[in-house]
Amino acid sequence: MLLAYYVPSTGIPEVSFDIGESYAGQIPVDWKKTGSKDPKFFYWFFPTVNPAGKDDVVIWFNGGPGCSSLEGLTQENGPFSWKYGTYKPVPNAWSWHKLANVIWVEYPIGTGFSTGHVTAKNNTETAAQFVEWWKNLVDTFGLQGKKLYITGESYAGVYVPYVGAAMLDKKDKKYFNVKGALYYDPVMPYADKLRLDHAAFPGFFRHWESVFAIPDKNKKILDNDNEKCGLDKYREAHLTYPPPPAPWKPVQVKGCDITAHFDEISTVINPCFNVYHVQDTCPVLWDVLGFPSVQYTPPGATLFFNIPGVRKAIHAPAAPKEWASCSGPVFVGDDDRYDPAEHEKKFQTLVEKTNNVMIGSGMADYIITSNTTALAVQGLKWNGKQGFQTAPSAEFVVPIINNTESNVENWAGGSVQGSVHSERGFTLATVKTSGHMVPQYAPPAAFRQLEHMLGRVKSLTDAEPFSVNISTSFKWPY
């Protein structure tokens, strides 16, 4: 059966190098139901050749809901990298499969090449569907008893706790031996009506003010919004250590919609403003995946996963005819029926049963700002207490990388990359130079965080060398 999923390591269109052993295709949720309307998840699996990672399996989800994890594989943490604005794919020195077996899954059903009739009404049902499917994948590749680590970004802030809790609730280490989780710039467990994003915005704006280049008259509007609704005062009152007891009153936004006023002027000043990475400016760069912030496909261009030879190599289905980075609906009625209280319980289960959960937050992300995440954390309860009890103060340190002329395509920054703080089995880290997709914008930072979750390095606060050589070789030793 494995041969049916085997992906040739060479000869993938546009990829001019050996990507190593991998397997891809669809596996049904139920082997007895394999018709065109029956649910099947699409995955791409890269086994590791690192002896230290043979018993570790990392699952990666992108967000949305309905955004493809093939985006994560191709532009963030997979073996080959084709980031927007670049000429062609290159080997990714920061590929996560250098540390563990990694499986990128298009989740939920209705995303990308994961096809079938959408029946899930909420995240509990999508997680249950995934858990059922996961057993089939484990049996297909003989992954019984492996240690599982669930990772992702954005709306995967919902996926990861729901899937993790559903697996842990099974109490079956043969198939669901969950040992930790790592996810980035996530949707956090709080009600939208709290409007924590508004309370976090003034500080975010001040941090990036020189980048935004907003005219003085517009800055006065933002200042008035802040003053009228007490946004800084709310943040100062709630982003404390320890925090005030939850539940909290919502942020006042009536008559002072600060983010709407910012949105009105930001794209006038910078028409190419990228909500996922605020340092971006014009021109809009061609993205072979047609994403993220400003979708632009030059005439005659084809998205990478719509190239016939690529689809053939990875055993993609004939439908959908046009793959897209984000698709859907993935819930019945296109409504996830989000329940923040339930989400918090899933988060608690994941943390309390693994004591190995980390959230990373890119400080150049406007969609979910770092202080929005920090505020949300202070409103959550886990392992007997609410929020962090002491203020984050430690520096998040990444070993300095040897950037040379021979590895320009993988140049990346090291040294102090942000902050990190841990209490009661949960860690929050910020990454100064990253936007929404930390493995894309700051790959060494994400690589380091994965090393730490897997137990390969002891600390995120010193420059202990990486556990593997950083090179573009996928053969052991690297």
Where are these regions (language model features)?
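Short glycine-enriched nucleophile-adjacent loop
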Residues: 157-172, 181
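Accessory cap/linker subdomain of secreted extracellular hydrolases
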Residues: 11-12, 57, 65-81, 85, ...
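N-terminal cap/lid subdomain of alpha/beta-hydrolase-fold enzymes
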Residues: 37-124, 375-378
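Short mixed-charge
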Residues: 78-98, 172-177, 382-424, 473-477
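Alpha/beta-hydrolase fold nucleophile elbow
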Residues: 141-155
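Alpha/beta-hydrolase-fold serine-hydrolase catalytic core, especially in secreted/extracellular enzymes
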Residues: 243, 256, 411-478
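Catalytic-loop region of hydrolases
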Residues: 1-57
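Gly/Ala-rich beta-loop-alpha elbow adjacent to hydrolase catalytic centers
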Residues: 106, 152, 156-160
